[in-house]
C-alpha cells in the first residue's frame, strides 16, 4: 500500500536545494571534481592499525595514515573483513535489496510503499521521467544460497521477488522495472577502532 508522496522542493530554501539523482551520475560528478591525485584505484588493503591515526597497510608495502576511514567497497567488502576479523563477518539479515529503473512513472514525487515483509521507494533521478526503484524484501536463505553470488543475478530469482511485491501492491512492477540488480543485505556489529 502506498503510504506517502514526498515533494522534496518543500525542503528547499535559498541556501539548500534537495534533489535525487542516479548513482552513476554521482560517481561521474565525484570523479570529475575530486583531484585525480587524491584517488587511488586498484590498491589492495591488507591491514588496518590504530595508533594516533588510522594506518592502512597495502600489499605494495605502502602505508598511509588517515583521520577517518569510510569502508564503501561493497557487499563483500575486503575492508570490512579486515575490520571485523576479531568480531566475525557481517551476518545475512534475512533481507534482499532490489534496485532498478522505471521510465515514465506517473508521479514525480518520491513514492513510498509498505507491504508485508517488503517496502519500496520510487523516486525521480532526472527531468527526463526516469526513476529509481529500490526495494527491501524479507527472504530467508540457507548458507549455500547466501554464498552463491550468481543466485542474485539469476532472472528467475529476481522475477520471483518482483512478483512477490507486485502481487501485494497496485503496481505491475514486473512490467515497469528495468535493469534490475539484486543483492543480499548484511548487518555488522558496531565496532570501535
Language model region names:
Residues 1-84, 88-101, 142-144, 151-155:
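Conserved N-terminal helical subregion
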Residues 4-18, 22-28, 59, 63-64, ...:
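Conserved FAD/dinucleotide-binding core of flavoprotein oxidoreductases
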Residues 44, 50, 103, 118, ...:
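Residues that form or immediately flank small-molecule/cofactor binding pockets and catalytic motifs
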Residues 93, 102-106, 185-186:
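Short amphipathic alpha-helical patches
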Residues 182-193:
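FAD-binding beta-loop-beta segment adjacent to the flavin cofactor pocket
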Amino acid at each position: 500500500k502506498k503510504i506517502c508522496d514526498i515533494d522534496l522542493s518543500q525542503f528547499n530554501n535559498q541556501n539548500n536545494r534537495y534533489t535525487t539523482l542516479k548513482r552513476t551520475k554521482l560517481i561521474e560528478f565525484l570523479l570529475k571534481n575530486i583531484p585525480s591525485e587524491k584517488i587511488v584505484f586498484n590498491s589492495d588493503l591488507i591491514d588496518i592499525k590504530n595508533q594516533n591515526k588510522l594506518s592502512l597497510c597495502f600489499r605494495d608495502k605502502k602505508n598511509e595514515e588517515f583521520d577517518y576511514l569510510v569502508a564503501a567497497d561493497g557487499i563483500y567488502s575486503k575492508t570490512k573483513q579486515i575490520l571485523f576479523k576479531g568480531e566475525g563477518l557481517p551476518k545475512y539479515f534475512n533481507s534482499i535489496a532490489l534496485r532498478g529503473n522505471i521510465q515514465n512513472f506517473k508521479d514525480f514525487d518520491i513514492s513510498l510503499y509498505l507491504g508485508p515483509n517488503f517496502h519500496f521507494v520510487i523516486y525521480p533521478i532526472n527531468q527526463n521521467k526516469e526513476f529509481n526503484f529500490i526495494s527491501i524484501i524479507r527472504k530467508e536463505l540457507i548458507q549455500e544460497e547466501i554464498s552463491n553470488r550468481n543466485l542474485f543475478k539469476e532472472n528467475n530469482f529476481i522475477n520471483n521477488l518482483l512478483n512477490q511485491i507486485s502481487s501485494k501492491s497496485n503496481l505491475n512492477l514486473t512490467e515497469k522495472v528495468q535493469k534490475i540488480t539484486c543483492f543480499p543485505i548484511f548487518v555488522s556489529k558496531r565496532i570501535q577502532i
